[in-house]
Structures are given as structure tokens and as C-alpha cells.
């Protein structure tokens, strides 16, 4: 590394970024998320050799929301062939809001990528077809990757999302009309919202996602999570489509593959080195953590890290 890592470096970055708190807005279209304290700020790093660094609210759990879309894709990759997955969902950035219907209509019900809502719903539809208990399987995967046995779903958040699910239901039904959604819409929506309602901390997320920095291998599991090629493909998708319609801006400022969620979390990958998880609940206009991006920008500048 260009800079020797320690917790003090991370604490200093949080101090630099904290004045941004108050400039974003906590997600309020999901009532259960609107009550989250917007002043929270945390970061954790897990290296490929198992070292852990953290600062701020790194051990407080929060709703990971769309970060879970990476995990559902990983599970799908373990149960479906490459051809089966990518004939139903694309690999390109959308340039549109994550819950857009217009682009989906124009492109005959094939979502642009698995990290927008439509694409994640197709992936969940696929999991419903191959898994007897999709929600339990996701918990097993996350608990195994993180090494933490009590990670679970926030059922209050999942219920709140389901009660305000008109747009996601419309997306699912639109895809069903094009023949790209095969199972009961309500059942798949429930699975999808539970995945989004996973509660994890920055520390747990960094440990969970370090396999993407380690050619598909988790640091404490013998069996590879995905192949080295699949890890590279997932990182590529995160780089092009992980930050909603602001992937280009994020690439310019931070330069790492990443996936965000409207709970305020972001996971970023430094291939061959580390996974980084940040959390700040206040979002920018694209639905990404405003202070979280600033933390990652400062960190990559100090470390001299970018994939570009």
C-alpha cells in the first residue's frame, strides 16, 4: 500500500467529511427508513489477508438495501449458467433512475443490468425457481461470508417496503407481460424486500464482500464463493452500474467498483487488496450516500488507489 493503514487514518477522514452531514437527505419514501439518524457515519476495511480497520459507527447495523443486489446475483451465479442469467438481464448501465419503467418498456422487458430494481427482481424471480427457501438461503450465504451468525432481516423495513411497493409491482408485472417474469409477483416481491431489509454493519459488509477483492475467495471459507472470472465480472458490473445513474461521476471521483443502497451504505472493492464499507444515511439526488462518497474519495486519494 502507498500508505500504511490504521484506524487513525480512517478517523481523520471521517473528521474531514463530517461537515457534509446535513447537506443530504435520508430516504423518506420508505417510512421505516425515514426515522434513521442522519448524523451516523462509519467506515470499515477488510483486507484480503483478514486485517480489519474501522472508525466511527462501523459496528452499527443498518438496512443495506440495494447492496443486497450483488449478493442475490452471487447466489444466482451458483445456481444458473451464464447463458441462463444473461439472456434475461443485461450488463449495461441504464442512465435512468433505478426504478424506471420507461426504459424497461422500450427494451421489451429486459432490464439493463442486475443492479437496478427491474434487474434485481428478475434475479429474485430466478432464485424462486431454483431454491426451496430463497430467504433462508440468503441468510445462510451472508452469515457464512461474514462469519456472523445473527445477521437477519429487519421485518419492519421489509413490511414498510411491501406496503409501498406499487412501482416495483408495476415493474414486475410489466416484465411478466413480456414473458421475463415467471413466478408469483407477490412472493418474489416479498423475497426482494427482505433481501433489501438485511441489517448489517460496515464491519460485517467489509468482511462479507472481501471475496470480490480476493478473486472470488472468502478469507475464512475453503470453498470459493464465485470463480475468479465471475468476481471480475461482478466488479465490472459494479463499476459501470453500481451507483445508479451517477456511476460515471463516482468513477471520476473515486475510481473503484462499488454498490450503494438507499440505506446510506456503499461497498467498494480494491481488487487484490481490500473491501471497503461506508455508511452515512443522508443521500444525494441520485440516492447515493453523500458523505459516504466523500469518505471514499478521500480514502482513495490518500491510498493512491484506482482501477483506472
Curated annotation (Swiss-Prot):
GO MF, one annotated term: glutaminase activity
GO biological process: glutamate biosynthetic process; glutamine catabolic process; negative regulation of growth
Residue numbers binding substrate: 66, 117, 161, 168, 192, 244, 262
EC class of the enzyme, as a word: hydrolase
Keyword rRNA-binding: no
Gene3D superfamilies (UniProt xref): DD-peptidase/beta-lactamase superfamily
Catalyzed reactions per annotation: L-glutamine + H2O = L-glutamate + NH4(+)
Enzyme Commission number(s): 3.5.1.2
Superkingdom of origin: Bacteria
Keywords: Hydrolase
InterPro entries: Beta-lactam/transpept-like, Glutaminase
Subunit: Homotetramer.
Family: Belongs to the glutaminase family.
Listed HAMAP family: Glutaminase
The name this protein goes by in its record: Glutaminase 2
Amino acid at each position: 500500500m502507498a500508505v500504511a493503514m490504521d484506524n487513525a487514518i480512517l478517523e481523520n477522514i471521517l473528521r474531514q467529511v463530517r461537515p457534509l452531514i446535513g447537506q443530504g437527505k435520508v430516504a423518506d419514501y420508505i417510512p421505516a427508513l425515514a426515522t434513521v439518524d442522519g448524523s451516523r457515519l462509519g467506515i470499515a476495511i477488510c483486507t484480503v489477508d483478514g486485517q480489519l480497520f474501522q472508525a466511527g459507527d462501523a459496528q452499527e447495523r443498518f438496512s443495506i438495501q440495494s447492496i443486497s443486489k450483488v449478493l442475490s446475483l452471487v447466489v444466482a451465479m451458483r445456481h444458473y449458467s451464464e447463458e441462463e442469467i444473461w439472456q434475461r438481464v443485461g450488463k449495461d448501465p441504464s442512465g435512468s433512475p433505478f426504478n424506471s419503467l420507461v426504459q424497461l418498456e422500450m427494451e421489451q422487458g429486459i432490464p439493463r443490468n442486475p443492479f437496478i430494481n427491474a434487474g434485481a427482481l428478475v434475479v429474485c424471480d430466478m432464485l424462486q425457481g431454483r431454491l426451496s427457501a430463497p430467504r433462508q438461503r440468503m441468510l445462510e450465504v451472508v452469515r457464512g461470508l461474514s462469519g456472523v451468525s445473527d445477521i437477519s432481516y429487519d421485518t419492519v423495513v421489509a413490511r414498510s417496503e411491501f406496503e409501498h411497493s406499487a412501482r416495483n409491482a408495476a415493474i414486475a408485472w410489466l416484465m411478466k407481460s413480456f414473458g421475463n417474469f415467471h413466478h408469483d409477483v407477490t412472493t418474489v416481491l416479498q423475497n426482494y424486500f427482505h433481501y433489501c431489509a438485511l441489517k448489517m454493519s460496515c464491519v460485517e459488509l467489509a468482511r462479507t464482500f472481501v471475496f470480490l477483492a480476493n478473486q472470488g475467495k472468502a478469507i475464512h471459507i475453503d470453498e470459493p464463493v464465485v470463480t475468479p472470472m465471475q468476481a471480475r465480472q461482478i466488479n465490472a458490473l459494479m463499476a459501470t452500474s453500481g451507483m445508479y445513474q451517477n456511476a460515471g461521476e463516482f468513477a471520476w471521483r473515486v475510481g473503484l467498483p462499488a454498490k450503494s443502497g438507499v440505506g446510506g451504505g456503499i461497498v467498494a472493492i480494491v481488487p487484490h487488496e481490500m473491501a471497503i464499507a461506508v455508511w452515512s444515511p443522508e443521500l444525494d439526488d441520485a440516492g447515493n450516500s453523500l458523505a459516504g462518497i466523500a469518505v471514499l474519495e478521500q480514502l482513495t486519494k490518500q491510498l493512491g488507489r484506482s482501477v483506472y
